[in-house]
């Protein structure tokens, strides 16, 4: 926690200072290169000149957690990789944010097994969920815009990690994924043949 956040109490109004700090934070979110599976290919594609991620101030991908603000978890998180993800998150300085990119990072994707973590939010707090399998670069940019909107509403009187998204968004996303997964495994019983008078066999 920084000196400024320690100095003021929660009932102290910092509207003008909040505006300046939030503007600086949202305009220079530095993501960390943390690709785990196929979603990382789309994350790398988003950093090319065709998509121009510099518009959002996120063109500086940092290889070190100590120099980054945003951890984009792109891909499947296995149980062996989970402690590494948690440790890297703890090494990031405040303020820090987490984006779950793709179905695997959000809810485990199609890998509903004992070896796969069913959502990275079980080990680190997630701010934005980017849907898709894998998500296109446009989806990643939409997630960055949502993160910038969230940063706009932060205040120095509260630690950034204390302000998290409502869990209803994740619950709705998980429910839709489970319905889609259950729909692919439903056994459809053959329909009974129609009864036509005079054609019944004994």
From Swiss-Prot:
It catalyses: a quinone + NADH + 5 H(+)(in) = a quinol + NAD(+) + 4 H(+)(out). It is an enzyme of class 7 (translocase). Its cofactor is [4Fe-4S] cluster. One of its GO terms (cellular component) is plasma membrane. GO terms for biological process: aerobic respiration; electron transport coupled proton transport. Gene3D superfamilies: 3.40.50.12280. Its EC number is 7.1.1.-. It is a peripheral membrane protein. [4Fe-4S] cluster binds at residues 38-39, 104, 133. It holds the Pfam family Oxidored_q6. One of its GO terms (molecular function) is quinone binding. It is found in: Cell inner membrane. Coiled coil: none annotated. NDH-1 shuttles electrons from NADH, via FMN and iron-sulfur (Fe-S) centers, to quinones in the respiratory chain. The immediate electron acceptor for the enzyme in this species is believed to be ubiquinone. Couples the redox reaction to proton translocation (for every two electrons transferred, four hydrogen ions are translocated across the cytoplasmic membrane), and thus conserves the redox energy in a proton gradient. NDH-1 is composed of 14 different subunits. Subunits NuoB, C, D, E, F, and G constitute the peripheral sector of the complex. This is NADH-quinone oxidoreductase subunit B 2. It comes from Koribacter versatilis (strain Ellin345).
């Amino acid at each position: 926690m920084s000196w400024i956040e320690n100095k003021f109490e929660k009932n102290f109004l910092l509207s003008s200072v909040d505006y300046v700090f939030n503007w600086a934070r949202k305009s220079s979110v530095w993501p960390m290169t943390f690709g785990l599976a196929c979603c990382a290919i789309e994350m790398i594609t988003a950093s090319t000149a065709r998509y121009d991620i510099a518009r959002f101030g996120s063109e500086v991908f940092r290889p070190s957690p100590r120099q980054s603000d945003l951890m984009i978890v792109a891909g499947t998180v296995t149980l062996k990789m989970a402690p590494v993800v948690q440790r890297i998150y703890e090494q990031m300085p405040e303020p820090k944010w987490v984006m779950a990119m793709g179905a695997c990072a959000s809810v485990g994707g199609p890998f509903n097994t004992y070896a796969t973590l069913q959502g990275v939010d079980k080990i680190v707090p997630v701010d934005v969920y980017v849907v898709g399998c894998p998500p296109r670069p446009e989806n990643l940019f939409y997630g960055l815009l949502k993160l910038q909107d969230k940063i706009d509403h932060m205040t120095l009187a509260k630690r950034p990690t204390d302000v998290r998204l409502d869990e209803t968004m994740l619950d709705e996303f998980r429910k839709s994924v489970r319905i889609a997964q259950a729909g692919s495994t439903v056994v459809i019983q053959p329909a009974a043949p129609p009864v036509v008078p005079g054609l019944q066999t004994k």
